[in-house]
A protein has these predicted regions:
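N-terminal subdomain of nucleotide-sugar transferases
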Residues: 1-75
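Active-site proximal beta-strand in glycosyltransferases
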Residues: 18, 106, 121-141
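Short, well-ordered alpha-helical microsegments
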Residues: 59-60, 115-118
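Hydrophobic/aromatic ligand-binding patch that stacks against planar heteroaromatic rings
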Residues: 42, 118, 122
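A conditional alpha-helix N-cap/helix-loop micro-motif detector
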Residues: 32, 87-89, 112
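A short, charged, and often flexible helix/loop element on the N-terminal side
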Residues: 69-97, 146-148
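Short N-terminal targeting/anchoring amphipathic segment
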Residues: 95-116, 126-129, 133
């Protein structure tokens, strides 16, 4: 993994390649999407290269917050009771192919759905550092959306 630290006088630090995997993102309006929008904007501002992997959300092909991340759309299915959001399918082979071609320095998994699970499995298999955040208590929401 390349360091983002400067190697000498006058050198410009090299940004990291960061991959963000999520089930939801702008222009959807929810806490996870808004938080990730700020995270990605901050990473881009600091000259990191960002790849965003998310399910296609009907007509939404580009994130509403920014145009700089490389966006990879994957198939998804509607969340029962929450038809405006689609969860990503566990696209393990596609993730493996993407990361073999352009290996990220780190992967951030923002949601723990099937796509997020597949990302953790493939990152671990590929020896790529992976981190995750807890944004939503889906176990609690599952009762509300009648999927338990």
């Amino acid at each position: 993994m390349e360091s983002s630290a400067s190697t000498g006088a006058g050198d410009v630090p090299k940004g990291m390649q960061v991959c963000v995997v999520t089930e939801t993102f702008s222009p959807e309006v929810n806490g996870v999407a808004m938080t990730l929008g700020h995270l990605i904007m901050g990473l881009l501002k600091r000259k990191h290269l960002v790849t965003l992997i998310r399910p296609r959300q009907h007509a939404y092909d580009r994130p509403g917050c920014c145009t700089k991340p490389n966006v990879v759309l994957v198939p998804g299915l509607p969340v029962p009771g929450y038809k405006t959001i689609r969860f990503g399918l566990p696209m393990r082979r596609k993730l493996q192919k993407i990361w073999n071609i352009n290996r990220p320095d780190v992967i951030y998994v923002a949601t723990q759905g099937p796509l997020g699970w597949a990302a953790v499995v493939e990152a671990t298999r590929g020896n790529i550092p992976v981190i995750s955040g807890f944004h939503t208590n889906f176990h609690r929401y599952a009762q509300h959306y009648h999927v338990t």
